[in-house]
């Protein structure tokens, strides 16, 4: 988070993360309008991150070059880590935010729920996915996305943003719908949690710090 000349907080972050497995640049603006531009080399993951940024009303640009010739795992995991880092950085001292958010998202036969506490204490609980998502691949005609990584995405996001994140699937059948409903539920919960609260000027904690 940076500040303008007038002292108004600008809740933006840029993260550059490079390893032998991936090269990532993320630009995030929490006070955006849902303008999203994502290219990770994994088309279904692009689709999920586009949904997340759009439904959170974040302006989000993601550029990832990963070793997808091996598999998508490193690319997806590392991008989720960097996105969590960007979220944590953009939140700054967390003054004036609502802190908590939750959302139920239906997608046809599926219903998912997410709850967020921007607590500074990283934790993730992920429950309810049907067993068949442990071995489902969503591929189209390009680099496949293995739905077994869904939990890892949410864990990586939560740990690196330093938030408590609970995600659950109440019911569902189609792997695409189940996965997308979860991403959208997380997006809507984050949108609520990071929104400015007009009734709060300081840090929303009795401890005075998050």
Swiss-Prot record:
Catalytic reaction(s) noted: D-erythro-1-(imidazol-4-yl)glycerol 3-phosphate = 3-(imidazol-4-yl)-2-oxopropyl phosphate + H2O
GO cellular component: cytoplasm
Biological-process GO terms, alphabetical: L-histidine biosynthetic process
Broad class of where this protein is predominantly found: cytoplasm
Gene3D superfamilies reported in the protein's UniProt record: Imidazole glycerol phosphate dehydratase, domain 1
Alphabetical keyword list: Amino-acid biosynthesis, Cytoplasm, Histidine biosynthesis, Lyase
EC number: 4.2.1.19
Subcellular location: Cytoplasm
GO molecular function: imidazoleglycerol-phosphate dehydratase activity
Keyword presence, Lyase: yes
Pathway this chain belongs to: Amino-acid biosynthesis; L-histidine biosynthesis; L-histidine from 5-phospho-alpha-D-ribose 1-diphosphate: step 6/9
Protein family: Belongs to the imidazoleglycerol-phosphate dehydratase family.
NCBIfam families xref list: PRK00951.1-6 (NF002110), PRK00951.2-1 (NF002111), PRK00951.2-4 (NF002114)
Protein name, as recorded: Imidazoleglycerol-phosphate dehydratase
């Amino acid at each position: 988070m940076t500040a303008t000349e007038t002292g108004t907080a600008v809740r933006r972050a840029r993260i550059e993360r490079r390893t032998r497995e991936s090269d990532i640049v993320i630009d995030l603006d929490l006070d955006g309008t849902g303008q999203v531009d994502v290219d990770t080399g994994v088309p279904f993951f692009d689709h999920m991150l586009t949904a997340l940024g759009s439904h959170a009303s974040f302006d989000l640009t993601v550029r990832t070059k990963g070793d997808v010739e091996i598999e998508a795992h490193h690319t997806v995991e590392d991008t989720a880590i960097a996105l969590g880092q960007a979220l944590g950085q953009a939140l700054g001292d967390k003054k004036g935010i609502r802190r908590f958010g939750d959302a139920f998202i239906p997608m046809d036969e599926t219903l998912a729920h997410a709850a967020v506490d921007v607590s500074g204490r990283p934790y993730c609980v992920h429950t309810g996915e049907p067993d068949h998502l442990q071995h489902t691949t969503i591929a189209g005609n390009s680099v496949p996305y293995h739905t077994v990584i869904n939990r890892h995405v949410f864990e990586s996001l939560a740990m690196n943003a330093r938030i408590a994140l609970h995600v659950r699937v109440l019911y569902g059948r189609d792997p695409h719908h189940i996965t997308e409903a979860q991403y959208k539920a997380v997006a809507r919960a984050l949108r609520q949690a990071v929104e400015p609260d007009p009734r709060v000027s300081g840090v929303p904690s009795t401890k005075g710090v998050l």
